[in-house]
Amino acid sequence: MGTRRDVRFVSSGVKLPCADAAPAPAPAPTLLSAALPFARIGRAIDGVVRHVARSLPRLPVARAETGAGAAAAPIALPRRQKDGGGGGGGEERVLISEVAVRGKDGEPLERPELEAAAAAALRACRPNAALTVREVQEDVHRVVESGLFRSCMPVAVDTRDGIRLVFEVEPNQDFHGLVCEGANMLPSKFLEDAFHDRHGKIINIRHLDQVIKSVNGWYQERGLTGLVSYAEILSGGILRLQVSEAEVNNINIRFLDRRTGEPTVGKTQPETILRHLTTKKGQAYNRAQVKRDVETILTMGIMEDVTIIPQPVGDSNKVDLVMNLVERPSGGFSAGGGISSGITNGPLSGLIGSFAYSHRNVFGRNKKLNLSLERGQIDSIFRLNYTDPWIDGDNKRTSRTIMVQNSRTPGTLIHGGDHPDHGPITIGRVTAGIEYSRPFRPKWSGTLGLIFQHAGARDDKGNPIIRDFYNSQLTASGNAYDDTLLAKLESVYTDSGDRSSTMFVFNIEQGLPILPEWLSFNRVTARLRQGYEIGPARLLLSASGGHVEGNFSPHEAFAIGGTNSVRGYEEGAVGSGRSYAVGSGEVSCRMFGPLEGVVFGDYGSDLSSGPKVPGDPAGARGKPGSGYGYGVGVRVDSPLGPLRLEYAFNDKQARRFHFGVGYRN
């Protein structure tokens, strides 16, 4: 054992070395309970008091002093007084002429401060006081409970001047070191800070009791199952603490029938569930960590209910975790509706219907298959997605999505609405790609993808066209279709799911001209949203912007204006350009129930980049290139997200209704 005065972990314990070389610690008679450090001492006190109770009333002489004026043999006590007060309950009182504190051998203590501490603990025992046995008993308890003494024996001595009451005390040992066993998770610095100034001082049981409580509190605050189960003072002034931490033994999965609640055979592979758990076999049992694991399993989307029940394993400190799982139906058909941008006149921008089939647990491995068809008056989208939320063999939680899509969307965002001599333009796209996503830092996630797109414009009869009514080109290559191979990189930051939180999205897309006729361009976009709580109201600020450089299709330009851009304008009516910037501010306040009122203002600009788009579609249609809008609206919470109905004015004093589902982008 070294001479350093610090705390350090040795094997599974913590040791505070002695200041001087000390003999190997061996258990001393003093044992302390973790739950009540004074329990054993209290029992000893009770035994002493019972002895005093037997001796004082008959012969309160435990030891006769010798010398001049002192009797060598016990003598009878003076006449006792009856306790007439209610507190004594009729007990006899003995008049005490002197009260003293001495060591166990009857000699004065070497440390005057210890004698003073014992004397200060006395309440009833004072010179010239008539005392009962109960009052002496209470003062004995007070002396021991001061934490500095391992024993206290009251001794009555008959002297020439009367009865002398001597409290013979035995101080605790000086503190020279600490051994803490079983504390695998408790930081060593925690005990260093608790005992760094205790070297060479009397071991104070009160201080030790506070340390034990703080250790137990450390585990409780962190959701850990652990406590100090045993404490003792070894010879040489060494404290020994035994910490018991619950350890996870096994994790067992049990599937329950969603109707009867009885055990059944599950469709999900057990390893698919276990790999999502942060709680592992051999770790300390952490209630907070287990709760997070339950939430993680629920977010997989394949379970209806999840509970984890700890069960003790025999007399050990280990627990088995039994996970009860109720599976959701794996797949099925669904139908619904939504909002389309195909019709841009009137309070509603158009309705679309949808039909989908989904399987959320393919092969019992939480893989997702989605097949959907959406159809509106102009819009139509056929989409096939296959997603593996966590690739097998990967330890970074990387997901993979394979996508095939065939869509037809209105070209009104860039190329305007219907013309008397020219029907509506639609943009047809056939897209296929693969994307990989993973979290790479807390609150940050990233996506890397490769996407091929075959896109072109069509007239109202479905025939390919390369120029519109204004003779503006509709493709970059001059062919009926443009082919593009895009490499995509996206980074997303979110600090929570609350609307008052921060969100930042940064996206880069690069066209790869593998073949000469494939387009080559670079597109950069960014979006930022920040919310603030201001009393009962909420302020939401958002900004977005982007730029495209290179040879790109006109329909890939940034469209400004509309429900998710500058309200008060029709979709794409402010402008379309190679660059854009849009800012928005909203103040919302809860009115009653699920209804929320909002006041907003938007501004957007193409940053004078409209003429740089191939064919200058914005200039041909007289779009201003910049504009602002403001208005009021209401929102209603729904299972689909907030339903938004807004009434806005623009800087041309035109007014317009906007209806949307979900939060603005």
From Swiss-Prot:
Source species, domain of life: Eukaryota
Native source organism of the sequence: Oryza sativa subsp. japonica
Recorded family membership: Belongs to the OEP80 (TC 1.B.33.2) family.
Gene: OEP80
Miscellaneous notes: Probably not processed upon targeting to chloroplasts.
GO cellular component: chloroplast outer membrane; membrane
Protein localization: Plastid, Chloroplast outer membrane
Residue ranges occupied by any POTRA domain in the UniProt entry: 246-328
The UniProt record lists the keyword tRNA-binding: no
Main location: plastid
Identification of the protein by name: Outer envelope protein 80, chloroplastic
Example GO BP: chloroplast organization
